[in-house]
């Protein structure tokens, strides 16, 4: 692989990416709370019939990532230690829902390395 061709590193250079944490949410002072985003996400899933019998009260939901002021509901590969960029994005200030189909997996190590730099 050529240097500089790592899709994870290239994506991180052009976007503000954090692993989801309440600390980041509080620091950013978003207008849409995680609870509100979760409610929007569940409604989105129900409206598209992706989940038929979801009992929200008994289901723990949280975004996987925060990217460019969006709560991102995506996938984590625990074995390969990667997190997907694709999935459902909810704007943390407006509540607007979009889907991202970019087939990019970010290395968890790269995310943490970027955020640990001063």
Where are these regions (language model features)?
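C-terminal motif of bacterial Sec signal peptides marking the signal peptidase cleavage site
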Residues: 3-4
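Exposed beta-strand-loop-beta-strand "reactive/processing" segments of non-cytosolic proteins
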Residues: 52-99
């Amino acid at each position: 692989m050529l240097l500089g061709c790592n899709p994870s590193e290239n994506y991180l250079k052009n976007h503000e990416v954090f692993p989801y944490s309440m600390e980041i949410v509080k620091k950013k002072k978003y207008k849409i709370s995680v609870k509100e985003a979760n409610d929007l996400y569940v409604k989105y899933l129900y409206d598209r019939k992706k989940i038929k019998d979801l009992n929200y009260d008994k289901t723990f939901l949280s975004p996987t990532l925060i990217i460019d002021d969006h709560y991102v509901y995506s996938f984590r590969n625990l074995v390969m230690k990667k997190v997907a960029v694709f999935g459902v994005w909810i704007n943390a200030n407006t509540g607007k829902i979009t889907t991202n189909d970019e087939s990019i997996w970010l290395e968890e190590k790269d995310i943490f390395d970027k955020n640990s730099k001063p």
